[in-house]
Amino acid sequence: MRQTKTGILLANLGTPDAPTPEAVKRYLKQFLSDRRVVDTSRLLWWPLLRGVILPLRSPRVAKLYASVWMEDGSPLMVYSRQQQQALAQRLPDTPVALGMSYGSPSLESSVDELLAEHVDHIVVLPLYPQFSCSTVGAVWDELARILARKRSIPGISFIRDYADNHDYINALANSVRASFAKHGEPDLLLLSYHGIPQRYADEGDDYPQRCRTTTRELASALGMVPEKVMMTFQSRFGREPWLMPYTDETLKMLGEKGVGHIQVMCPGFAADCLETLEEIAEQNREVFLGAGGKKYEYIPALNATPEHIEMMANLVAAYR
């Protein structure tokens, strides 16, 4: 009996190809056209997206990307490539591909890359530790569309999330401990997760519960009392209510109340990107300090650290 050849597909959100208004506009158009991300009626959404949002937001967002752009590309792409390469080195007999829901490399090109390696089983690892229909669901949808066009379909193992995975929690905890050792233990550890519309949670998306699970497990691993760990949600978009409490409003409130030293981690981001390096490390730092806070540090994402790569290898091992 022929032995199954397995490949691994690392999936993430995506990024513009360049920090320019044109590239950002292409990326945002694809991203904000996905019904998993924005499910508003197309009759209402298309004119708003094309006539207002893209023309106004693209130049502004391009400037933000330019402020964090690295020599080899956007931070998300640089760190994602490092993750792919490190995991491939860790698993030398297993092809590892990287695909993005929006932009390039596309999920379709990554599937084709693995099929060209003659794999007959693909382990899909969306790099979203906490499930949401707007992220993991989007990967699932696109993968289904890709495979629907194939005459031969490989076996698929799809990892829904890993919010309470032991290796993941330990890697986060060690990162926090290293930051505490470097900067001193803060008055409060704030865990900021990407937000989603509250309506999505009301309709069954268990994302907030998965975020609470990670928060609880991380606090336990650190031996921290609940009063010293807070969970918030960032990056809201549009006018409808999103998951609360909001990160920026919370930081302002904490600064005004006299909390002096805060460290912020974003456990839901497997790789640093615009939302962590600019929004959290820069914008929200100014919010906290401007409200009276004294000391603020951002704890980097796990990126391609050895512990993170080992976690990925262990996570996919059960499916290989």
From Swiss-Prot:
One of its GO terms (biological process) is heme biosynthetic process. It is found in: Cytoplasm. This is Ferrochelatase. The gene is hemH. GO terms for cellular component: cytoplasm. It comes from the Bacteria. The keyword Iron-sulfur does not apply. It catalyses: heme b + 2 H(+) = protoporphyrin IX + Fe(2+). Belongs to the ferrochelatase family. Pfam families: Ferrochelatase. Keywords: Cytoplasm, Heme biosynthesis, Iron, Lyase, Metal-binding, Porphyrin biosynthesis. Fe cation binds at residues 194, 275. Its EC number is 4.98.1.1. GO terms for molecular function: ferrochelatase activity; metal ion binding. Pathway: Porphyrin-containing compound metabolism; protoheme biosynthesis; protoheme from protoporphyrin-IX: step 1/1.
